[in-house]
Amino acid sequence: MKLLKYAKEYKFSATLGFLFKIFEAALELCVPVVMASVIDKGIGNNDTSYILKCGLVLIGLAVFGYLFALVCQWYASLTSQSVGTQLRKDMYHQINTYDDANLDTLTAPSLVTRLINDVVQIQLAVAMTIRLTSRAPFLMIGSLFMAFMISGSLSMIFVVGAIILAVSMFSITIISMPYFSRIQKLLDKIALIARENLKGVRVIRAFSNQNHEIKRFNKETKNQKDEQVKVGKIQALLNPFTYLIVNFAIIIIIYASGFQVNVGSLSQGEVIALVNYMNSILQALIVFANVLSIYNKATASYQRVFEVLETKPKVEDQGVYETLTPIENMIEFKNVNFGYLQKDVLHDLSFTIKKGETVGIIGGTGAGKSTLVSLLGRNYDTRSGEIWIAGKRIEDYKLATLRKHISYVLQNTSLISGTIKENICMSKPYQADIMNQALEVSQAKEFVSNLSKGIESPVVQGGKNFSGGQRQRLTIARALYKQADILVLDDCSSALDYATDAALQKQLQELKEMTKIIISQRTASLKRCDRIMVLYHGELVGFDSHEQLLKDCQVYQEIYESQNSKEGETNG
């Protein structure tokens, strides 16, 4: 079992937990024997001192049993929490190796649920294994053994009852197991809906769509509740059936033992001991039933957790080159084709981008602009064709090396909680001169300087304490601070006014050593680019200067005319 690899690291604490629980169970097995002795010798002979001695023995058994149980609980908690912590660390590390294709399959809400809820279920199973699965078998086998020592014939009643209960428990476990897998998947759906609602709460309110979203959420929670009720009904059969079998066995024992008491082959105390041992078996089986319920949930969680741990990045890091030196033909696409699942997005793209060149990319929605630049850092691998950077195939570079030389600013601004300085300096330690240049080029210097704490100003989660334009400028500053050889700006100036956008484009032109790729919906934002790439349904239909495209490229002409006519109407 794969989980044993984690438990082995804590085998010392787990073993001690097992041992102390067995010690407690052994003491518990002694109680019926002492009670039988009290009845037969103490009460039977009216020996008060013997009864008091036995009473002290029972108190001693109880105290030591309590202490052993406490030690077991401590070691069980230590082991289960340690295993859970290590699982979470390994999962988090593995998730951070995932590429975009992995995250398309294992969604963020599902990963969060697995990282938290599923690991908790495994922790509980580990703790219960140490605390209960050591005690219950020992108690049951020990009770059967002690019962055989008292009366071999009556003990057969114990054996038959235990077999019936074991078969019943196993059957109910097999029937209920699929329900827990479905319940965990439904929890993923609920988490996904909740996350979407929390992220898009303003949009939902703006369109008065709360009722629809509430219905969506209620539908999935009802489905989850229905599955819980179904499995609850199945498992509810277990305890009553267990009590029925055990109590029926006790009645038979009392009835059958009456004859043996009459003929003197069995004492009254031994009958009481047999009943107590039957009750011990009942307790052990109830514990088994509860543990099996926990194991059912943990099995589903175990599969989901190890799916995360065993899912390898689809983009394999098998490159050998650890350095990247810019050359004249900085980026080359050679007959590149790509698609998501069954949908083709890019078709037979071939082009070259020179070192230090500023290239714009424009096209309609779904043209493949963002997809194209995502291939540069191997967020996805191509279906066919090759991409070369600095004279080598991108697959031949170490992933860390390749990504170190490419800096992205994505459409959706992503700022983490902390300070402006911490957000911008994510790629390397703080250097004042590089920071000032990054803020100046990104047009963020003025508004950051006006903040009372400057670059030490706090950033709340998602950068919600800044406007959309300010967030975009900070993410551009972060990308510039990296000083990568290739800078990709993916429609990241949409929230900037025209004057700020124009100033940004002018400053970017001054970065002569950096190869820049700018995606935008505005032709005005791309006018200064050395060349502009025009995509139409994943095909390259134009790649030239702004002026030349206006003459030769129909798609670019239509985009330009539609934007300028709108601006003209607005100005008019």
PLM feature segments, named:
Residues 8, 14-71, 75, 148-153, ...:
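Transmembrane helix-loop-helix hairpins at lipid-water interfaces of multipass membrane proteins
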Residues 9-11, 75-76, 97-101, 117-126, ...:
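An intracellular "coupling" helix at the cytosolic face of ABC transporter transmembrane type-1 domains
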Residues 19, 23, 27-31, 56, ...:
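Hydrophobic alpha-helical transmembrane segments of ABC transporter permease domains
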Residues 19-20, 27-40, 61-108, 112, ...:
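Juxtamembrane helix-loop junctions of ABC transporter transmembrane domains
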Residues 47-51, 60, 146-161, 167, ...:
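Helix-loop-helix
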Residues 324-572:
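ABC-type nucleotide-binding domain
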